[in-house]
Amino acid sequence: MLSLAAPAHAELRISDLAVYLNDHEVTVHVVLLGAVPHGLHESITSGIPAHVRFTVELWQYIRLWPDQLLTTRTIERSLAYNVVTKEFKVASLKGESRPVYASRELRDAARVLSEVRSVKMSPATALDPAAVIYVRVHAEAALNGENTFVARMAGTAEQTTRQSDYRTLERVR
């Protein structure tokens, strides 16, 4: 007897999470892998949009107490396919202002959809130089923006979380 294997799907992962601390501000760079799994290509090319939402949180570590949430930024993007012009369009829905990106290649559109650069979290002057901070990123990808338990079980939505290393603004001696 031959058994049919279920199609493999790519798991949503946060590949690069970089936190940059300089004299002026705290910025974050995030790259999401698997934002457009192969199983969703047919749905996207038939006109159903895919949504990606990044929730970037800046936390302060406090010893022997619960950590304190300092600020949150939400960035939401949409990937839509125009059947007539055969173009993929990536539009920013929330959290950033950028022009609509159009491409005939899904790979290029998926790269623009899943890469977030220079998210400004907080001015450096607003943070205590001796405080220990870290960044937590929660990413969601879903068809038509519907990220529910049923959608995740059906394979049309996924979510993941990743936390950065602990950092401080002052140099350790």
Q: PLM features: residue spans?
A:
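Structured domain cores in non-transmembrane regions
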Residues: S43-R107
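A beta-strand/beta-hairpin structural motif
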Residues: V28-L32, V83, K89, K94-E96, ...
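Short N-terminal segments immediately surrounding and downstream of signal-peptide cleavage
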Residues: H9-T27
